[in-house]
A protein has these predicted regions:
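Pre-recognition alpha-helix immediately N-terminal to the DNA-recognition helix
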Residues: 19, 23, 50-56, 115
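N-terminal helix-turn-helix DNA-binding core of bacterial DNA-binding proteins
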Residues: 29, 33-80
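N-terminal leader segment of winged-helix/HTH proteins
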Residues: 1-42, 91
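Short amphipathic alpha-helical elements of helix-turn-helix/winged-helix folds
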Residues: 26, 54-58, 146, 153
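Short, hydrophobic-biased segments on the C-terminal half of alpha helices
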Residues: 67, 85-86
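C-terminal regulatory/oligomerization modules of transcriptional regulators
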Residues: 1-13, 62, 138-157
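Charged, amphipathic alpha-helical coiled-coil/dimerization segments
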Residues: 2-7, 86-145
Length: 157
């Protein structure tokens, strides 16, 4: 027994397996590992993929999108988002151009970026399908609905 610790007093859970946070930690770590192995073959990190897919989604109808909108949807702080976009730009996958107001920069995919996303998105979705294959369709739908409740408002709109 660890000296000075009494888990019956400091935790509401009898075992770690009853802790949603503990379970989420293990699930997310395992899931990320599976996704990262797929993306590595395409030369992308997981954050780069998230931003690339976000740019692709937000510009799919020809709309202009700035870094603020990308960061909001991707759940990234402005500095991290900017660094990831800079890395995508250096790889030739995205480009930034000044917006009409001059303060923000619009981001779009290059032809190479679109090509990579056309490979990466189906590969990630296949990895997702494989990872979640222990769940039947009803369980997967319920899990997705539950996750949607936990995502901060405005992120996936």
């Amino acid at each position: 027994m660890s000296e000075g610790l009494n888990f019956e007093k400091i935790s509401v859970h009898d075992t770690p397996k009853q802790s949603p946070g503990f379970l989420l930690w293990h699930i997310s770590t395992s899931w990320r590992t599976s996704i990262e192995s797929v993306l590595k073959t395409l030369g992308l990190t997981h954050p780069q993929f998230v931003v690339l897919a976000t740019v692709g989604w937000l510009t799919r109808n020809g709309d202009l999108v700035n870094q603020v909108a990308i960061g909001k949807m991707a759940g990234l702080d402005p500095n991290t988002n900017s660094q990831i976009i800079k890395g995508l730009e250096q790889k030739g996958l995205a480009k930034r151009v000044p917006s009409s107001d001059g303060r923000a920069k619009n981001v779009s995919l290059t032809k190479t970026g679109a090509h990579i996303l056309n490979q990466a998105l189906p590969a990630v979705e296949k990895a997702d399908s494989h990872f979640f294959n222990l769940l039947n369709a009803k369980e997967l739908n319920l899990m997705t609905q539950t996750f949607q409740k936990l995502v901060p408002k405005g992120v996936t709109d």
